[in-house]
A protein has these predicted regions:
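Polytopic alpha-helical membrane proteins, predominantly small-molecule transporters/carriers
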Residues: 1-425
């Protein structure tokens, strides 16, 4: 039995919801990278990435526990146990990519690094087309929008790469560009497990819980190797204890953006959801240029090139994202879901309910374990918060408050619509 058809009105609702989730993801993913500016305070980029991943780990277990409960996470993975391996693999790819972004920010700054690693959208589009039938039967208008958008993104990335080289040393520019592009390739490939999970009926909140095991495990291994052993790593963590709170918070903020991104991928696909969430490049430019003054001291032509490059990439992202799937293309998604169901012997109702944004199982009450997770995460933030000191960074507070306010408004709006339409399914 194949997954049944979804009513056209329901499809349109879920696709509008996916677009909203992608926009909110961009805002929160952009804000989460701001604490990475701390690398200029003398912290190792690997240490920064490790502590952020610790915050990610806390967020990936506590937010699903509060929203649905870990019992429903367990129920989902009993339906599709093969996705545990895919989730952990995706987490490993993310950990390496995130570490590369810290190096890129250190060498290039937020304003330049963001658009470069957002070439992950091009990789994501390729995998979506090759493996999951995205854009098949989409028509020439949608194909033109997606391919034209990809060309715009690539051109904008080239402009930003060129302008970056004139304001940092040659070696730093080369290393930063390589790190940013490497992160883009890894993140683009990471979306294969995402799409497999959601075509199989998996709830995004369940998938990210096991995803983070791969993240933390891989990041711990990378940190111990790069820094020089567990004892050296522990010593550096103690020396940076006054900054741990901010980096944990950055990881937690990143989780919020990533969860929105997961819902975007689920409801509008990799080839559209990832480019839309990559609007974080604009947030990165706003935070870097306006809140931190990264472009201060640059010449007029250099600033103009940075802005033109970002706008060009944003135009490409908009072209791709506005090319919403039509009925014939959506049918290809259903066929891809059927292939996943047959390949792994999944329950047809579980897959069908997932495609419709519904739960195949009744809601369950929160357990004592759920509240223990929330309490442990809260304790970690309180403990590190007592030792925290404000980083010695120049910050335009008016801009920071305005950007934060917009992000909070997007968060509230998206959560309300997600709850009303899907009950977080």
């Amino acid at each position: 039995m194949a997954p049944g058809p979804v009513a056209e009105e329901r499809v349109r609702l879920l696709q509008r919801l996916g677009v909203l989730c992608g926009v909110a993801a961009g805002a929160w993913l952009g804000a989460a990278e701001v604490p990475a500016k701390l690398v200029s305070s003398g912290l190792s980029p690997v240490l920064v990435s490790l502590v952020m991943v610790m915050g990610v780990f806390l967020g990936r277990w506590t937010l699903p526990a509060m929203a649905r409960g870990t019992s429903q996470t367990r129920s989902d993975f009993l339906q599709a146990p093969h996705l545990v391996i895919w989730a952990i693999l995706a987490g490993c790819l993310w950990a390496v990519a995130n570490t590369l972004t810290i190096f890129a920010i250190r060498d290039l700054g937020l304003s330049i690094a963001f658009p470069l690693w957002n070439t992950n959208a091009i990789i994501g589009i390729a995998w979506g087309v090759l493996f999951f039938g995205e854009l098949k039967n989409a028509g020439w208008v949608r194909w033109t929008a997606v391919s034209g958008g990809a060309v715009l993104m690539f051109g904008g990335g080239l402009i930003l790469a060129r302008v970056s080289a004139s304001h940092v040393s040659s070696q730093a520019a080369t290393q930063g560009i390589a790190a940013a592009l490497g992160a883009g390739v890894l993140w683009g490939t990471m979306y294969i497990p995402y799409r497999k999970a959601y075509l199989s009926g998996m709830n995004p909140l369940s998938f990210v819980s096991f995803f983070t095991i791969g993240e933390l495990g891989m990041m711990a291994l990378l940190s111990a190797h790069y820094i020089g052993g567990v004892m050296t790593l522990w010593q550096q963590l103690k020396e940076a204890r006054h900054l741990l709170f901010w980096l944990l918070a950055a990881g937690f903020v990143w989780v919020i953006g990533d969860i929105f991104q997961q819902y975007a991928v689920k409801y509008i696909g990799v080839s559209r959801g990832i480019p839309l969430s990559n609007s974080n490049q604009l947030w990165g430019l706003l935070w870097g240029a306006l809140a931190f003054g990264e472009l201060r001291g640059w010449g007029h032509s250099a600033v103009a090139s940075a802005i033109y490059g970002s706008v060009l990439m944003a135009g490409g992202l908009a072209a791709i994202s506005c090319s919403i799937a039509g009925p014939s293309e959506y049918e290809q998604w259903r066929q891809a879901a059927t292939r996943e169901r047959k390949r792994y012997g999944l329950d047809a109702q579980f897959v069908s309910s997932g495609l419709e944004g519904k739960s195949a199982a009744p809601a369950q009450a929160r357990s004592s374990f759920d509240w223990m997770l929330v309490a442990a995460a809260t304790a970690a933030f309180v403990w590190t918060g007592f030792a925290a000191r404000w980083p010695s960074k120049d910050l335009n507070w008016e801009t920071a408050i305005a950007l934060s306010g917009i992000g909070l408004a997007l968060f509230a709006t998206t959560v309300i619509f997600l709850w009303r339409a899907t009950r977080f399914n």
